[in-house]
């Protein structure tokens, strides 16, 4: 059973309510463009540093509405199979590019390294021309013995496939690796820079871990996600050196236009704790 949240509403119900409210809000409202807060990361310009994390829009059906919410980037997924991916690609193709679109991928590991690698190659190949950036979701890695080596090995394997696709296609679609910072020993993140990735999406609400990740990754950008409740949390992550910040639960709790309020406060430097 889903854990209960604010007002006794569990996260699954809360997400469904937010999705319904989003569809209605964008039809009746005519929101002004959010303030311009351009940033540059992964070799691309973003209209602002605020993104929607994967897990809210699994298949891209809400892209147009989410772009009106003010996000500078929207991450679709997590997508695990070609069938799921093809459904999402149909929606992405109809989306007028406003926010950057990322596709969060997770190929199911098998006992056969070659088969696992081929699954990653298939997923990345299908998304190569559709997404602004790709995400290899390795956030399920835990802190068991050898996990640090496993994370690096997985990133190296995925990075090698990504590099091969770039050479074959004659183009570059940036690749980010998503991992849970609390399970990554000190010094491990620095090794990801040699794996051919363009950024790391670090899941953590711990300020010390976030600051350490920024130091270890430099010059690779950190995209921070996890535990963000309000605008002050976003400002704190950016001040700590994160290039981009993603939200999820706060969006479900605060409603469709929370991102616009947050960005307006970020632009003026007014960040009330507990508010937008």
PLM feature segments, named:
Residues 1-41:
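An N-cap/entry alpha-helix motif that binds or orients negatively charged groups
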Residues 22-35, 138-156, 179-220, 253-262:
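Glycine/Thr-rich beta-alpha phosphate-binding loop at enzyme active sites
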Residues 42, 51-63, 67-187:
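Active-site entrance/lid segments in N-terminal catalytic domains of soluble metabolic enzymes
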Residues 54-58, 229, 276:
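Short, glycine/acidic-rich beta->alpha junctions
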Residues 59-68, 118-122, 182-195, 212-222, ...:
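Catalytic cores of alpha/beta
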Residues 70, 74-82, 137-140, 198-206, ...:
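Glycine-rich phosphate-binding active-site loops on the catalytic face of alpha/beta enzymes
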Residues 103, 200, 269-270:
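Expand to "…catalyze enediolate/carbanion chemistry for C-C bond making/breaking, isomerization
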Residues 254-276:
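Short histidine
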């Amino acid at each position: 059973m889903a854990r209960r949240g604010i007002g006794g509403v569990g996260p699954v119900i809360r997400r469904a309510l937010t999705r319904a409210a989003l569809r209605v809000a964008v039809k009746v409202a005519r929101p002004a463009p959010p303030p311009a807060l351009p940033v540059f990361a992964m070799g691309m310009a973003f209209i602002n540093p605020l993104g929607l994390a994967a897990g809210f829009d699994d298949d891209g059906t809400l892209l147009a509405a989410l772009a009106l919410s003010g996000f500078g980037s929207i991450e679709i997924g997590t997508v695990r199979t070609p069938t799921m991916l093809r459904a999402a690609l149909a929606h992405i193709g109809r989306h007028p590019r406003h926010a950057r679109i990322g596709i969060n991928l997770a190929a199911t590991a098998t006992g056969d390294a070659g088969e696992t690698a081929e699954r990653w190659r298939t997923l990345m190949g299908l998304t190569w021309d559709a997404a602004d950036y790709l995400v290899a979701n390795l956030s399920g890695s835990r802190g068991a013995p050898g996990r640090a080596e496993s994370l690096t090995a997985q990133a190296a394997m995925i990075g090698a496939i990504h590099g091969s696709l770039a050479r074959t296609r004659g183009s570059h679609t940036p690749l980010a690796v998503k991992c849970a910072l609390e399970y990554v020993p000190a010094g491990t993140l620095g090794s990801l820079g040699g794996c051919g990735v363009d950024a790391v999406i670090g899941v953590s609400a711990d300020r010390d871990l976030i600051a350490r990740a920024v130091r270890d990754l430099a010059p690779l950008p950190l995209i921070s996600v996890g535990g963000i409740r309000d605008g002050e949390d976003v400002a704190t992550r950016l001040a700590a050196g994160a290039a981009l910040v993603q939200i999820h639960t706060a969006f479900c709790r605060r409603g469709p236009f929370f991102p616009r309020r947050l960005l307006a406060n970020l632009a003026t430097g007014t960040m009330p704790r507990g508010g937008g």
